[in-house]
Amino acid sequence: EYAKFLPFIDNNIDLADLISEIQGELNASHLGSGYRPRGRDGDATAQLAFFPDPDHTGDGVRIAEIIEGSPLDAADSEIEVGVVITAIDGAAIGAGENWYPLLNRKAGEPVRLSLTDPGSGKSWHETVKPISGGKLRGLLYQRWVRSRRDEVERLSDGRLGYAHIRGMSDGPYREIYEEVFGRHTEKEGIVLDTRFNGGGNLVEALTTFLSGEVYFTAVPRGRVIGTEPGGRWTKPSIVVMNEGNYSDAHCFPSAYTGLGLGETVGMQVPGTCTSVWWETLHDGALYFGIPEVGYLDTNGEITENNHLDPDHEIDNDPKLEAEGRDQQ
């Protein structure tokens, strides 16, 4: 069926798509192929990390919000919300003009911004170093986490803590460990958000982390100052999950549910709790997945292609999400 396409495959991008189509016939997770070009000299738009005002109709770009950690978010900068960027490195920005090409390949390089404050009429210049698209995504992620944390704080009247685990690896685990036993150590319970987590291998560490039981209470001179274990969460928890959970991010809520550690809320997680080996070919750019290990859950059922339903199903309405409201 796929042989007819072979005469027309003359590059690895198309070959990866064809391999993915063929593997897709197996209807299993952790399959498919991809192409990672090795060259790093292509176009790359640097970022100033702010939200433009969509209602601005004049020349330049008016700033609606400066993202925390942005190159514009500096102690010695006069740039603030409402200021208009009129030119980048001397190139004027006309009304409605696509100004992003002016930042091509300029990540980490000094860039001169021409600025105007419509309120005061003041005009001036500042030099900043734009960041990469990857760093911008990191700042946006942290912005999202802060807003979720603030919402949990508000809705629980300060009684519950919140932590999001972005991946199943050592770094994200250290982040939530620090968050839970730092900011939230005195909270009555923890909301652990796993949404959009692409997986890894952390299910054992997380279930151990959340399954602590108090065996000692420290009481010097009659005053309670803490409990042991000190490195495991012993209070209630709840896990938020959605359709974006994958691989070990399915394994974890499945194990969490099977062990009776708490309840889950959100949307159905696809049955993708399977171990995989990603094989890279000799060119170093073309890779494909080889699923190797399936798992039986606490009910003796295979997790692959066996989805997990939440205890409390809540679907986020995209219209409300656009308003910044997270119903889950």
PLM features: residue spans?
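A generic structural motif
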Residues: 53, 114-118, 296
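PDZ/PDZ-like domain segments forming the peptide/carboxylate-binding groove
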Residues: 43-96, 170, 293-294
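Extended, small/polar residue-biased N-terminal targeting/export presequences
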Residues: 4-56, 122-147, 327-328
